[in-house]
Amino acid sequence: MLVPVVDMKLTGQNIASLRTQRGISVRDLQLMLGFTTPQSIYKWQRGETLPTIENLAALACILDVTIDAIVAVECRKTGK
């Protein structure tokens, strides 16, 4: 059986790459998302945490991509 697994590190790399490709600084993204500090963005980019679904939708709009372009999902086999 295959189960979907989010690759947090690759998702973070996608966020960082898409952000820099569009010339958006972490500070700019922080302001666009209404965050008081950039810590969450840095944690996303390092693959430590994932954005909430609301923040993921906002990122997709800001970066002008689909959510699929941000979130890296792989299917892994389970032992069943």
Q: Predicted regions span which residues?
A:
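A short, Lys/Arg-rich alpha-helix, primarily the initiator
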Residues: 1-22
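Short, charged recognition helix plus adjacent turn
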Residues: 1-5, 61, 69-80
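Residues within the helices of the helix-turn-helix
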Residues: 16, 27, 57
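The alpha-helix within a helix-turn-helix
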Residues: 19, 30, 60
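Residue-level detection of the helix-turn-helix DNA-binding "recognition helix"
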Residues: 20, 34, 46-48, 75
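Short alpha-helical DNA-recognition segment
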Residues: 23-43
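Short, basic-rich loop-to-helix N-cap that marks the start of a DNA-contacting helix
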Residues: 47-61, 77-79
